[in-house]
Structure formats: structure tokens, C-alpha cells
């Protein structure tokens, strides 16, 4: 039994899961690929369910999704689903619209099944320190090249000293994120994560160091690494 700490803020989690994962070149959306006899999405949701102050998880689904409600985890009383949009921003906003009486929201990629509870707790603890919010991130360690898109040639090397690799979850105040996303849509600005929307509106979320094991399943080889982490229970080590 999970008891909610009444002295801590209640949090809603939104998991955009409307993508089809075209880069994986498979018939099933990548969030429904199985690792260790469970789908990637089930692994992702299970970690979020462990935190006592996440009172509800909203999963934004593709309107043609025929997989989610076949999963046993979909019947968990803390999980609901909504129809997402064509883009991530629309899927997140679809989730925010149904949020009531909660001040904070976490947005987490459906295909990051290796999030550790330790990192989740570290991020949530930031609520007491920064009213804007925060994201998990890691300093860039590789050399980054800017390319000519058509010819795929290196044009110049990007100075990496102040560069961070954005991860999820990302944590913000509900109304602040909702307003920033609406402005992004109104201004027709393209963003790839929620922090970008806040940055566009003049806010600066904190960067919280996250684990390198919190990988996003994008390419087939990512499945091998995720399987290794989950099989050997080394996510929190």
C-alpha cells in the first residue's frame, strides 16, 4: 500500500505514448515492444507508480492504439488514458487539460523504461527549491558536429562546455506548462521537449544530473542495452 505524504505536493505524471516509432522499422509501436516479458511502456509506468506523491498517471495514446487497454497495468486505478495529438506538444496538452486540483506535473517519455527511482526522487525534491521546475539532464561528453543536412558533412564543431543532454522526466507547475505550450502552438514554434516551451516563454528550469542509464529507446541497438539494465537490476546502482 502506498501512502501519500500530506505534507508533500501532489503530482500528476503525463506519459506521451502516441508515437509509432518509425525508426525501429517494426510493425508494433516501440512502446509496446517487450523486454523481460513486459512492454517498454509497462516498465516506464511501473517506476512512476512507485512514487507516493504521483497521484495519477495520464497516458496520451494514438487514436488508433489497439494495444494499451490489453495491458494489465492499464486497469490500475491511478492510470487513465486520453487521446493524444499528432505532435508531442499536443499529446502533453491533451493530458494537461484533464488535470484538476494538482499543482505540479511530470512529463516522461514512454520509451525511457530505465528511469531509476533515485533520479525520480531527486527531481521531485527540486519542488522545494525552484518554483519554475526542473529536468533531468546530463552534460554532453561527446564532440558535437554541426552538419550540412543534405550532404551529411561536418561543417563545424559545437563548443560543448555548457551543453547538456536533456532527459525526462521533466517537472513543472501545471498552469505554467499549460500556458507555455499554448503560446508555442499559437506562435507556431517547433519544440522537442517541454523545457523548450518554458525557455521560449522566458523561464529557466533547473538542470538536475540524471543517470546515463536513463536511455530513450530510439534505435534497435537501444533494446539490447535496456534489456541488460533491466535484466540485471542495475538501474539504481
UniProtKB/Swiss-Prot annotation:
InterPro entries linked to this entry: IspD, IspD/TarI, IspD/TarI_cytidylyltransf_bact, ISPD_synthase_CS, Nucleotide-diphossugar_trans
Purpose: Catalyzes the formation of 4-diphosphocytidyl-2-C-methyl-D-erythritol from CTP and 2-C-methyl-D-erythritol 4-phosphate (MEP).
One of the record's GO molecular function terms: 2-C-methyl-D-erythritol 4-phosphate cytidylyltransferase activity
Recorded family membership: Belongs to the IspD/TarI cytidylyltransferase family. IspD subfamily.
Reaction equations catalysed: 2-C-methyl-D-erythritol 4-phosphate + CTP + H(+) = 4-CDP-2-C-methyl-D-erythritol + diphosphate
GO BP, sorted A to Z: isopentenyl diphosphate biosynthetic process, methylerythritol 4-phosphate pathway
Stated name of the protein: 2-C-methyl-D-erythritol 4-phosphate cytidylyltransferase
Residues carrying the site annotation Positions MEP for the nucleophilic attack: 160, 216
Pathway assigned to this chain's UniProt record: Isoprenoid biosynthesis; isopentenyl diphosphate biosynthesis via DXP pathway; isopentenyl diphosphate from 1-deoxy-D-xylulose 5-phosphate: step 2/6
Keyword Nucleotidyltransferase: yes
Residues forming coiled coils: none
SUPFAM superfamilies noted in UniProt: Nucleotide-diphospho-sugar transferases
E.C. number(s) listed in UniProt: 2.7.7.60
Top enzyme class: transferase
Positions marked as site (Transition state stabilizer): 23, 30
Subunit structure: Homodimer.
Record bears the keyword Transferase: yes
Domain of life: Bacteria
Record's keyword terms, sorted: Isoprene biosynthesis, Nucleotidyltransferase, Transferase
Record Pfam families: IspD
Organism phylogeny: Bacteria, Pseudomonadati, Pseudomonadota, Gammaproteobacteria, Enterobacterales
Amino acid at each position: 500500500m502506498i501512502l501519500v505524504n500530506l505534507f508533500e505536493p501532489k503530482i500528476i505524471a503525463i506519459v506521451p505514448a502516441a508515437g509509432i516509432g518509425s525508426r525501429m522499422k517494426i510493425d508494433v509501436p516501440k512502446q509496446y515492444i517487450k523486454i523481460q516479458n513486459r512492454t517498454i511502456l509497462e516498465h516506464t509506468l511501473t517506476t512512476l507508480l512507485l512514487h507516493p506523491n504521483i497521484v495519477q498517471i495520464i497516458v496520451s495514446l494514438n487514436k488508433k492504439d489497439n494495444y494499451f487497454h490489453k495491458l494489465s497495468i492499464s486497469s490500475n486505478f491511478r492510470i487513465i488514458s486520453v487521446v493524444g495529438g499528432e505532435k508531442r506538444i499536443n499529446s502533453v496538452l491533451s493530458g494537461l487539460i484533464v488535470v484538476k486540483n494538482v499543482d505540479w506535473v511530470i512529463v516522461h517519455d514512454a520509451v525511457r523504461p530505465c528511469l531509476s527511482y533515485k533520479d525520480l526522487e531527486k527531481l521531485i525534491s527540486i519542488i522545494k527549491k525552484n518554483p519554475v521546475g526542473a529536468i533531468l539532464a546530463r552534460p554532453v561528453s561527446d564532440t558535437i558536429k554541426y552538419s550540412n543536412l543534405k550532404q551529411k558533412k561536418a561543417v563545424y564543431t559545437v563548443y560543448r562546455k555548457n551543453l547538456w543532454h536533456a532527459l525526462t522526466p521533466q517537472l513543472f507547475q501545471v498552469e505554467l506548462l499549460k500556458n507555455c505550450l499554448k503560446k508555442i502552438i499559437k506562435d507556431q514554434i517547433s519544440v522537442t521537449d517541454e523545457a523548450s516551451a518554458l525557455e521560449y516563454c522566458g523561464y529557466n528550469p533547473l538542470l538536475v544530473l540524471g543517470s546515463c542509464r536513463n536511455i530513450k529507446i530510439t534505435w534497435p541497438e537501444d533494446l539490447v542495452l535496456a534489456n541488460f539494465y533491466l535484466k540485471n537490476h542495475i538501474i539504481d546502482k
